[in-house]
Amino acid sequence: MLAMQAQPLPKDPTIRTGKLKNGMTYYIRHNAKEAGLADFYIAQRVGSILEEPRQRGLAHFLEHMAFNGTKNFPGKGKRLGIVPWCETIGVKFGANLNAYTSIDQTVYHIGSAPLKRESIIDSCLLVLHDWSHYLLLEDQEIDKERGVIHEEWRTRRAGMAVQRLQEQAMPKVYKGTKYEDCLPIGSMDIVDNFAYQDLRDYYHKWYRPDLQAIIVVGDIDVDKMEKKIKKTFSSIPMPKGAAERIYYTVDDNEKMIIDIEKDKEQPIALCHIYQKREATPDSEKNTEKYLRDGYIDALISAMLNDRLAELRQLPVPPFQSATSRASQFFLSRTKDAFSLSISCKQDNILGGIVSAVAAAERARQHGFTQTELDRAKKLRLNAAERRANMQSDYRNSHYVNVCVDNFLEGEPLLSVDYKLEIAKKLDREVTLADVNAAVKELITDKNQVVVMYAPDKEGFEIPTEKQLEQIILAAQQQDYAPYEEAELAESLISSMPKAGTIVSEQPWRHGFTELTLSNGMKVYTKKTDYEADAVSLRMQADGGTSQYGDEDIPNFALISSGITEAGIGTFDAVTLRKMLTGKSVRVSPSVGSKGQSISGSASLKDMEVMFQLAYLYFTQPRKDTAAFASLMSRQRAFLANRNASPKVDYNDSIRAILYGHHPRMEPVVQQTLDKVSYDRILEIYKERFSDAANFKTVIIGNFDEQELRRLLCQYLAPLPATNKHEQTNYSRIPQIVGGEKLVKFSKPQATPLANVSIFLTADVPFTPQSDLELDFLRRCLSIAYTDSVREEKGGTYGVSVAFDLDKDDHPNTTLKISYNADPNRYEELNPIVYQQLKNIAENGPAASSMQKVKEYLIKQYAQVAITNDYWSYIIWHELDDDVDFDRDYCQMVEQMTPAAVQRMARQLLDAKRCIEVTMLSE
């Protein structure tokens, strides 16, 4: 048995792999799902852990420089740079062209490249070739990028206390190791001042073939691609006397390591308890034993998380939330750990930690039950079966990730079918005794590290390190009674409703069929094979909270959660979750300002369960005062320190200013909860779902049409109908105020930051043409901002541009421009942001930008038009707005003119409805 488990696993035969003489690895896979497209990646076993002290932050800096001049894509008027060249073929910077740097790896990619010409394939490979060894790293470009990196640091740290706290914790968690100070963003003092040669030294030392892999997946000829890879990359030299790539280890510790870090912008206390253990070496991962060990670890985590979720549902829950997992320790891949993560309540920090530790200790002492194991195994097997059923739908990115994980992490390179075979074998062979023996090894009281991130706030009592150590060790030494649970029912519905009928049926647009049920509900169905094992459901009706006066505002925010937290029918939320374990189904009700809806999705075999849940959410919402008390307790704990982050005050201010302090846009605070009525919530919910005839229902997927008709008659046609056909009361829907306004204020911020949001509104024709003009405008603006504010000025990590077009809003169009920057540069940068919009309004967008956007949108259409989500988007616009956003889309894109985009920009400016809300640092 042990010998068999140690045998190498069979490699996925659909993925071709090889190694060039210079040591470079390659992976190639044909995938026809995305016709005419391919992904090109270069993965590197190189990250910030390899930096020398004077190079802190340069691994990440180098990643940025890979887009700022290479041998064959120098830019600056010589030849196109990588970014502008990629955008000429519809590969958008950020969305399709990007990279990331972590502690141990760096990965670059060109995604969804259109293979319209052989030269595009050659050029994409040439980009990877240059990334490997031929970056220019020119002085001037390095200096320009310093500001961009600094603003990325500012953006990531501001409003993200956890990142700052993590940085503070690392020297204690990793004392005496390379991991003490190794986060990729690095030191801003070094980023701002390093010598050019330091960056070049890092590049030439670590970017080399033996640490690199080329990955190409898509609609390609594998044989031809292999020849191209060999031709393009074989000449890249492997340096002589190359430095050893060391994977730094983490020592064990006898005494518990405890670190408590505080931050004024941290809203809640988070406690992470790690129990360290040895990680499986990459060389030992390609074995059945590795899969078996991982399978058992996943079972244990799933079962323990179910128990922790039960504690969260108590009328007075001990914590906000708690989860367990078996994974890598903190940030180091050379050490694994079992971990507990507890989100604590301010008034019960120690009690919450003890409750989570006790749940883990109970599992260690007594193990799990056969019923729990059966559910957890069912969950794993169902997931494996679903992956096998869906493998024809996998996008290129799925196979790329498999290859990246194999090269960088040593994960087995297995076919989906073999994974299913192994899952079935493990399901049969792994016993309760196996799992309960493993849990005694996984969960321990040795080799522990405890990290707490807490608010730095007067009156917020934080335990001492000594207290944490004492209560955790004490909880681990106690004896606990075995876990018990009630027996589950066999089915969700004890008494089936009397079936209704389909009274009419007719073809509808875009391949949909319109069915009218006996209760008056209209159902629109479209059978697709875009996803082999998926069906989606959305039921929607007008009305929502607009049907109720302002006295009910406190209840609105808790309607959806108040219903789902109670479970459904005769089952509480915990029991319902257990009953649905192993089923691929999700159904959730929602009551919004304009309407109410039920959304769902399922695998084909669980489609009936999806309809049963929808039926129950209509007819049998459950009252559970204990569950609601639990929800309210957690909400109060969450809101206790809500305003710790300045971002919260900023977003509150935006809503208040935009909507003229409308009461329906006020945030939920502690005082709001004081006015909430559970009985009123239930009453509103029942009223919203009392008239099935007012609902339109859309079902899309690879369903059996006769089976779908049976389910419609059995579960949707019997739904009650009052035939009131309520409409949305738009007099109660908040609208953005008119006029021009600049609101600028300052608040203390841990990381000095200018937060800028600009909103321009106007009324434009609600047409596909207007929608497309707005899309072109925002994309052309984004290109202009990248060139001017980011690249030329080094003033921000990025400027975000978004728009909204809603038929029933007045004004119906909003263009939002937002960015973060150094507060000291606000006066310099903000005029540039406005000027770029004025430039388009006065002169039109650049012809090159228009062409880039056209290439991207046409390519994107081919990708999204083979998804169920796209057709859901199309039909709901037709049903709600009587507008076809699909008709002649590509033709409209091709025919879009700079003059049309210019006209839209001018219309937004001429409306003179511009509101800017800016928060600076005190």
What is the predicted function of each stretch?
Residues 190-229, 667, 673-715:
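Internal metal/ion-chelating core segments
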Residues 63-67, 564:
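Active-site-flanking alpha-helical
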Residues 6-28, 221-309, 313-314, 374-378, ...:
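Proteolytic maturation boundary segments
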